[in-house]
Amino acid sequence: MGWWYQYYFATERGLLGYDKNRHDFAKLIWKIASPKWDFDDATFDRSAAAFDNPDHVAIVIHNYRWRLSLAPGEAKYDHLERRLQEAPVIAVPTITIGSDFDGAAADGTAYARQFSGKYSHRTLNGIGHNVPQEAPQAFAQAVVDVDRY
């Protein structure tokens, strides 16, 4: 199913649909992006409280439209955007994390050359895209380990 919803969000119908059904929609995306994660309602509800912020829908929709060049970015950050488009090498110590759910990108080789400092990549099996909640120990260990680099 991939990222189909980014195209839905590009439409006025997507904006209205997400605004009306943001909790159900988010739960669906959680299940799609992390199919093996058996989260309970309490876990979802803790995050879902943020969906009721008055600017939540506008921020989400703008983000997806901006990714598709359908909405402008913040002009005050244009200089940073230009620098990022050059794909600068990252010199700080880094640990990247992927999951076996990421398919060909899971092993990190596609972007490893972007790092010139001490670098390692960890592939976690059996999780989706919410590493901090699905694999909190492994995530925390990566933070601790990179601090020691």
Which ranges hold each PLM region?
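Catalytic histidine-centered segment of alpha/beta-hydrolase-like enzymes
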Residues: I127-A140
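Flexible "cap/lid" subdomain of the alpha/beta-hydrolase fold that forms the substrate-access gate
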Residues: M1-T123, V144, Y149
